[in-house]
Swiss-Prot record:
HAMAP family: IF_1. Gene3D superfamilies: Nucleic acid-binding proteins. It comes from Mesorhizobium japonicum (strain LMG 29417 / CECT 9101 / MAFF 303099) (Mesorhizobium loti (strain MAFF 303099)). The keyword RNA-binding applies. This is Translation initiation factor IF-1. Signal peptide: none annotated. Residues 1-72 form the S1-like domain. SMART domains: S1.
């Protein structure tokens, strides 16, 4: 099965939510709820309020996403 087309957007973490979820404001002013990718969890990369992140989303649900990268 081919991998689905994913959309990537840069954003800023605005709020930390329970269960390792984050509220992220994208550059196009949309707010979504995102969780960290498994690789970030495994390597214990911390994400805090105000961090610039890269969010990966599926075209089917544009309200949820996965944080795949934290910019330095």
């Amino acid at each position: 099965m081919p991998k689905e087309e994913v959309l990537e957007f840069p954003g800023v973490v605005t709020e930390l939510l329970p269960n390792a979820m984050f509220r992220v404001k994208l550059e196009n002013e949309h707010e979504i709820i995102a969780h960290t990718a498994g690789r970030m969890r495994k390597n214990r990369i911390r994400v805090l309020t105000g961090d610039k992140v890269l969010v990966e989303m599926t075209p089917y649900d544009l309200t949820k996403g996965r944080i795949t990268y934290r910019f330095k």
